[in-house]
Amino acid sequence: KNRGYSRYSPQIFIQNLNQEEIAQLQQEKYKYPGVDIRIRTLRDYTYPIASHILGSVGEVNYHDIEKDDYYVVGDYSGRDGIERTYEKELRGKKGVEIFMRDSRGRVQGPYRQGELDLPAQAGTDLHLSIDIATQQIAEQLMHNKVGSIVAIEPQTGEIITMVSAPNWNPGKLVGKERSANYQQLLDDPQKPLMNRATQAQYSPGSTFKVLQALVALQAKCVTSHTQYPCNGKSSSPIKCTHDHGSPVDMEEGIEQSCNPYFWALYRDMLQQDGYQDNHIAFKQHYNQWREIIASFGLGKRFEDTDVRDQAAGYLPTIQFYDKIYGQRGWKAITI
């Protein structure tokens, strides 16, 4: 559906011609009265990186046109990433030219010599917190790998690097090959269009140990001087992958990333006060632990951010474990 269609108004017949095609058409254009070539701007990406951050632009569809009267057939808009988040800021404002037409709708010239015309306004420049050098290094590190890297400025919370691998060259989704290239990305079994930095769910790994220590101190079930034994690879039920002395206090547990220390710490948090066989008290302690962990933002989407398409993490509830293991069938080691 082409709103504003008129047989006397310019209509797009074909677009995104290359130089060779333009030259060929110029030679034959005299045979086709009414055919003209017009130049328009097209998105250009300086670096072949940061595809999941930048996103892409694509031609608007019927729903876009119905939703926003800014668009007409042939316009482009941001489809994902920063391109979509800041579409209204980046697109600027269209210019206006008023023409006089005859009874058949044919243009007769500008109205009042164009004094009511309005010039187009360029979109706003957008400055990201991404550090291009760091982004390039991170993408090189993730070449031929699957996963993500995110680097954040601690003082401000700004994202300086965000990589999801595999990714693609954002320039591939510009121009006449966009549809074919996009379909190729859709069909790729490694799902390069998925932003693993914001949409995948991963276990936090050893970075979680520092948070675990803070929660234990807040719960006052241990002190920083509380020690637990570590027998290295012979430890049970959790083995240690580092070579260090025993017993281990909190400082050394963090420094050595000692698995047995943090297993014992977590066990005592949930079974404190001698409630090892009291599942009511055990679950109360689990709920307290879960609430504190959630207060750090785990299991939640980021708020007040321009990072799109986030998937929330998951902090299992008591009901989750009860359903899988039964009401008395799970312990600290299960978690």
Model-identified regions with their sequence ranges:
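Beta-lactam-recognizing serine transpeptidase/beta-lactamase-like catalytic domain environment
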Residues: 102-115, 147, 155-207, 211-335
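Periplasmic/cell-envelope proteins involved in peptidoglycan metabolism and beta-lactam response
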Residues: 1-177, 201, 285-295
